[in-house]
Amino acid sequence: MDKVKVAIIGSGNIGTDLMMKTLRSSSLEMAVLVGVDPRSDGLARAERLGIATTSGGLDHFVTTPEFEDVAIVFDATSAAAHERHASILAQLNKQVVDLTPAAVGPYVIPTVNMDRVVGEPNVNMVTCGGQATVPIVAAISGVTPVHYAEIVASIASRSAGPGTRANIDEFTETTALALESVGGATQGKAIIVLNPAEPPLIMRDTVLCLCDEADETEIEAAVERMVASVAEFVPGYRLKQKVQFQRYTRNSPLRLPEQEADFTGLQVSVFLEVEGAAHYLPAYAGNLDIMTSAALRTAERMTELDAIRGK
């Protein structure tokens, strides 16, 4: 089967890492890298690899001969930029995989809902924190109702480029919504920390869920199965320690300032780390790896299901 040609908009950290992964794909062909900064390392690297490039942004890319041959467009720019890109690409009948928090299309978490939404013309990969934590919330909510899910994603400051920094507010909003709509939590909250420590620290994620009483061994098994599923395409994704449990009873409830009633039930805490494959940035940048690996897996699944718009 012929490979499907793809283009990536955004020549920063995420776009360049995705480019390096796409070059390894058995079903996708890296056709064009699109940027706006002619001095960017991503564009220079693409040129050295013999990949077509443009520093004229999407506006110039759509006028080039290569555009017609591209079936899937990855957008690795910013939420604000994607709002405009989505409209242009929709009019031109291109399949879009959005790696920004813009969330124009439905959220995609490969291990949770990928096959249900890959047929949509524009799909959203949530955020790096969402890709790491929503699967865990979904695993727990598959065992017992999750009333509240809170996640903290800590990433190395050095791994966060201009696009990521511009998206901080959208990161928290989009991740929280995905915890609810895909993860199954009644209420979600997300926090991101850009850790400036040197040497840079590996990506760490904490997931805290308040849920109904349930069998702890069943929850732990569900979490471990989900971790194994994610690790199939993100090998550096793993549990940092065993799943932690704490029970709150009527005699010792958990007082929540934002809730009218005290919480009684089970608190589940899951601690994760994500080591990158170092295809572009070093292994500490697991936040890049999980985002780009999820996007690549989604696009490859589109080719498997022949669910590419305009084909």
Curated annotation (Swiss-Prot):
Biological process (GO) annotations held by this record are: catabolic process
**What superkingdom does the record give?**
Bacteria
Q: Which reaction does it catalyse?
A: acetaldehyde + NAD(+) + CoA = acetyl-CoA + NADH + H(+)
Which residues, by range, are in coiled-coil regions? none
| Residues binding NAD(+) | 11-14, 159-167, 287
Q: Return the InterPro entries for the record.
A: Acetaldehyde_dehydrogenase, Acetylaldehyde_DH_C, NAD(P)-bd_dom_sf, Semialdehyde_DH_NAD-bd
Q: Which CDD domains match?
A: ALDH_C
Q: Which Pfam families match?
A: AcetDehyd-dimer, Semialdhyde_dh
This entry's Enzyme Commission designation comes to 1.2.1.10
One annotated GO molecular function is:
NAD binding
Q: Which HAMAP family match?
A: Ac_ald_DH_ac
Q: Give the family from UniProt.
A: Belongs to the acetaldehyde dehydrogenase family.
- What is this protein's name? Acetaldehyde dehydrogenase 1
Species annotation = Mycolicibacterium smegmatis (strain ATCC 700084 / mc(2)155) (Mycobacterium smegmatis)
